[in-house]
Amino acid sequence: GKAIALGLAERGFDLVLNDIAAQAGVLEETAAEARAHGNRVIALLADVSAKVQVQAMIAEAVAQMGAIHAVVNNAGILRASDVEHCPEDYWDSVMDVNAKGTFLVVQAVLPVMKAQGYGRICNIASIGGKHGAPEQAHYSASKAAVMGFTRVLAQEVGPLGITANCICPGIILTDMGRVNLDDPAISNAWKARTAMARIGAPEDVVGPVAFFCSDDSAFVTGQTLNVDGGIVLS
């Protein structure tokens, strides 16, 4: 999320950044870095899995910024467990943030974009939604849901001047992914499966996100773009 925020700021986007209350410090640090590019940047706390909080966040964003031209749904969590022993709360929490959170943000922002006659929606899924891994069934299901949701959404909002697209990052060295990738054996195994023979950096996702959030993608909708260094080829 931070790399996307700073990358969009570098490209001239004004930003509304969001995170949960527990990450307030990190959120404000990111906002401060983004403002250094001369952009207008605000930071709003909200849990995307809570409808009331999402609606309040969107209302505040419109009140402060006047419009919402693009949305990037990037919130996500991962809690590892095999299917047989997966606690119900693991399943629920992952689905709530990854899938329902995307839905709730889109649902809240659509009236704004419809009134504008313009909007760009970029949902972040994962290559895990296409090629699952052991102990990630609930994560894989949540990201597959995001892809399916995006395809239907694109059909519904296309006539309104709104596009909806999806990005599937591969193995990226984020804070969430670092837990496993710090193990050289695991990291090297993923590199061996990737055509470009390296682990992705968060900055690798920025360009595709910027494309889907701009008029460069004006006639592109309902698409899922793999940003994975070629891991789908393995």
What are these regions (language model features)?
Residues 1-65, 70, 79, 89-90:
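Short-chain dehydrogenase/reductase
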Residues 81-84, 131-137, 159-160, 197, ...:
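Active-site loop immediately N-terminal to the catalytic Tyr-X3-Lys motif
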Residues 82-83, 87-92, 186, 190:
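Substrate-binding pocket helix/loop in short-chain dehydrogenase/reductase
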Residues 106, 142, 150:
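Active-site helix of classical SDR
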Residues 111, 155-159, 218:
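Alpha-helical segment proximal to the catalytic Tyr-Lys
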Residues 126:
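Residue(s) in the substrate-gating loop at a strand-loop-helix junction
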Residues 130-134, 210, 221-234:
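Short C-terminal tail/terminal secondary-structure segment
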